[in-house]
Amino acid sequence: QTCALPISEEPTPELAVADDATGASLEAEAAAAYREMAEAARQDEIELVLTAGYQDAAARQGAYEAAVQSYRESGCSEEEAAARAATVQPAPEASEYATGYGADILAADSMEKDTGFADTRAYEWLEAYAAEHGFILRWPQERQAATGMVFEPWHWRYVGRDNALAIRASGLSLEEYLALEQTK
């Protein structure tokens, strides 16, 4: 990940609860968009569940350290464990959960964070309609080389409706899209 923030610049987003059932919060604009999206999905008989949103520094640090430890326990060296962990759990200073824009979205009938979520009706619905609500699939399977992250069909990011529609139309990852925009 090349989007690390200097440690002195901890984001302080204005948060709002986005999912009453889980209590997960997002940045206020993203939370409102998520609520609208969840209601639209409900109209199509799909119950979206926001399983994770904003995380404070301690939560992000804990998640990263747990990922590193998991790789250490599987026999990786410290350096290899950190490198592998960074493909599944961004370092705390690079985590989008700090901004309140990163969102782990599953469905009531499919609550496992694994690639099998990509085979669900909820994922198909998100692929078709999330951009209309300002969300993009953050780490698409076909863009892993560009993002440096493994495919996570449950991990979405709020970028606003216009940006989401443009990114979806481009077929690029957020990194690729931003790089292209900078050349214009």
Feature locations, PLM:
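Extracytoplasmic cell-surface/polysaccharide-interacting catalytic and binding patches
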Residues: 1-184
